[in-house]
C-alpha cells in the first residue's frame, strides 16, 4: 500500500448517496471537441445528417486515423465552433437504436488477440480516444506503444462515486477490459485502487496497487509518480475504470457501450445520488428539476477541475464521471475576512470553521477575493504529495519559464494534478491553464 499524507479532501456539502439510480431521459448528446488536446477535426458529418451509434463523426488530422464516433443514434442538429473555428461540440438529437456493430469474441480469446486486431477495433469504434498519454494528456498515436498502462479504479475527487459499486456490477466486462489492455502492451497494466476488493484479471502483467490518503491519492498522475515516473522518453497511458468496462463490452458483445454511471451532487442538488446516463449526455436534460431555485453553475466533472457546462458545452465530458452543481457566489461580504467565519472553510485555518471537525460547507463559485500576487506561505506544499518543489514549479509556470518547469517535473503533470494548488492559492492563479500553456510550448519546441 502507498499512503499519501499530503493533500486535501474538500469538505463540501451535497455528498451523493452511493446507490445507482436511473437518470432522466436524455434527448440530446454531444462530443466536445475542446476536450481533446491539440485535436484538429476533419468532419465526416454535417447538420441534418442521420447517424448511427458508433458511426464516425470526425477524425483528427493531427493524429491520423484516430476516429471520434457518435455516442447515440439520431440526427446531427448542431456543429458548434468558437474562435478561430475551433470545434466546440457536435450535437445529436437522440432517435432510434441503429448502431454500427463490430466483431465479438469469447472471454477466453481476449488475452490472446493480436495487438493490431485490438487496435483496429478500438479505433473503428471510437474507444481508442479513452486512452490518454502522459506527458501531454493526448490521445495516443495509433502506431505508438507504451510499457505502462494505468487503470484509475479509485476516485478521490470531491463528491465522486465509489468505483467499486460500478465495477462490481460489471465484473465480467471489467475483467475482459483488463485482458484487452494486457494484450495492448508489452509492459505492465497497473490497476490502482483503494483498499476495496475488485475483480482481478489472471494475466501476469496486470498488477494491483493500493493507494490510501486524501485527494489527489486517486489521480493517475499520483499513481504514475510512485510506480512509473514519466518523462519525454518514458511515456505512460491512462484510462478510467468505466472505459475499461466499455472496452470489455465492445469485445464481448460487438457493440459500443456508452452507458455512464455518474455522481450528480453538490450543495444545490435536491437529491444528490448516482445516476445512470449516457456518454455526452445533455446536462440540461440530466439536471431538469433536480436543482434548488436560484442562480447555479452546472459543472461537468469535479468542482476542482471540471468545466462550466453552458451553451455549446452543456454536455457530459468524455472523461468526466460526475456532475457537480454550485451556487453562483456573486454576493459581496463587507469585511468578510474579519468575521469569525463559523460556516467558512479555510486551509490556513483563518476561520472558526476549522474547529468543527466533520462539518460540510455550502461552498459557492466565489473565489473570496480578487487576483493578487502569488504568496508562498506553505499552502502548496501542504496539498502536493508528489516529490517536487511546488512553489518553485508554480513560480516558473507563472513566469512562462518552460525549461525550468520541465526540470522541476512539469512533464509528469496534467491540469488535474495542480487543481488543489489552484484551490489554496491566495493569488487566485489558474495553474492548470498555465501548465497547459507550458506543456504546449515544450511539445512545440521538441
From Swiss-Prot:
The keyword Membrane does not apply. It catalyses: a ubiquinone + n Na(+)(in) + NADH + H(+) = a ubiquinol + n Na(+)(out) + NAD(+). Its EC number is 7.2.1.1. InterPro entries: NqrA (IPR008703), NQRA_2nd (IPR056148), NqrA_C_domain (IPR022615), NQRA_N (IPR056147). Keywords: Ion transport, NAD, Sodium, Sodium transport, Translocase, Transport, Ubiquinone. Transmembrane segments: none annotated. NCBIfam families: nqrA (TIGR01936), PRK05352.1-2 (NF003759). Composed of six subunits; NqrA, NqrB, NqrC, NqrD, NqrE and NqrF. This is Na(+)-translocating NADH-quinone reductase subunit A.
Amino acid at each position: 500500500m502507498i499512503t499519501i499524507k499530503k493533500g486535501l479532501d474538500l469538505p463540501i456539502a451535497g455528498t451523493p448517496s452511493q446507490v445507482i439510480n436511473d437518470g432522466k431521459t436524455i434527448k440530446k448528446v454531444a462530443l466536445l471537441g475542446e476536450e481533446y488536446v491539440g485535436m484538429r477535426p476533419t468532419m465526416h458529418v454535417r447538420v441534418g445528417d442521420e447517424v448511427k451509434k458508433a458511426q464516425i463523426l470526425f477524425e483528427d488530422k493531427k493524429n491520423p486515423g484516430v476516429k471520434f464516433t457518435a455516442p447515440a443514434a439520431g440526427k446531427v442538429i448542431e456543429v458548434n465552433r468558437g474562435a478561430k473555428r475551433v470545434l466546440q461540440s457536435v450535437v445529436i438529437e437522440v432517435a432510434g437504436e441503429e448502431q454500427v456493430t463490430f466483431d465479438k469474441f469469447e472471454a477466453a480469446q481476449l488475452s490472446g488477440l493480436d495487438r493490431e486486431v485490438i487496435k483496429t477495433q478500438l479505433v473503428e469504434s471510437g474507444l481508442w480516444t479513452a486512452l490518454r498519454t502522459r506527458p501531454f494528456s493526448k490521445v495516443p498515436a495509433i502506431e505508438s506503444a507504451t510499457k505502462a498502462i494505468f487503470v484509475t479504479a479509485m476516485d478521490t475527487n470531491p463528491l465522486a462515486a465509489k468505483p467499486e459499486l460500478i465495477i462490481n456490477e460489471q465484473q465480467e466486462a471489467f475483467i475482459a477490459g483488463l485482458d484487452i489492455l494486457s494484450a495492448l502492451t508489452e509492459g505492465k497494466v497497473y490497476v490502482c485502487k483503494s483498499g476495496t476488493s475488485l475483480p482481478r484479471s489472471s494475466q501476469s502483467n496486470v498488477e494491483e496497487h493500493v493507494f490510501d490518503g486524501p485527494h489527489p491519492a486517486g489521480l493517475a498522475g499520483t499513481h504514475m509518480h510512485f510506480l512509473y515516473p514519466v518523462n519525454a522518453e518514458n511515456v505512460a497511458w491512462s484510462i478510467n475504470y468505466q472505459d475499461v468496462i466499455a472496452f470489455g463490452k465492445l469485445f464481448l458483445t460487438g457493440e459500443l457501450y456508452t452507458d455512464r454511471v455518474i455522481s450528480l451532487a453538490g450543495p444545490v442538488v435536491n437529491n444528490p445520488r448516482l445516476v445512470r446516463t449516457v456518454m455526452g449526455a445533455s446536462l440540461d436534460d440530466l439536471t431538469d428539476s433536480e436543482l434548488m431555485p436560484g442562480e447555479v453553475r452546472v459543472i461537468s466533472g469535479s468542482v476542482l477541475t471540471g468545466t462550466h457546462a453552458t451553451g455549446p458545452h452543456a454536455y457530459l465530458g468524455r472523461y468526466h464521471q460526475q456532475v457537480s452543481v454550485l451556487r453562483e457566489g456573486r454576493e459581496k461580504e463587507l469585511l468578510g475576512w474579519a468575521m469569525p467565519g463559523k460556516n467558512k472553510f479555510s486551509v490556513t485555518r483563518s476561520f472558526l470553521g476549522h474547529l468543527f471537525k466533520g462539518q460540510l460547507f455550502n461552498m459557492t463559485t466565489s473565489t473570496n477575493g480578487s487576483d493578487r500576487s502569488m504568496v508562498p506561505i506553505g499552502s502548496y506544499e501542504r496539498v502536493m504529495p508528489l516529490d517536487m518543489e511546488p512553489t518553485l514549479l508554480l513560480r516558473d509556470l507563472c513566469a512562462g519559464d518552460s525549461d525550468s518547469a520541465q526540470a522541476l517535473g512539469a512533464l509528469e503533470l496534467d491540469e488535474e494534478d495542480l487543481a488543489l494548488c489552484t484551490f489554496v492559492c491566495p493569488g487566485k492563479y489558474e495553474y492548470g491553464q498555465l501548465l497547459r500553456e507550458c506543456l504546449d510550448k515544450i511539445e512545440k519546441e521538441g
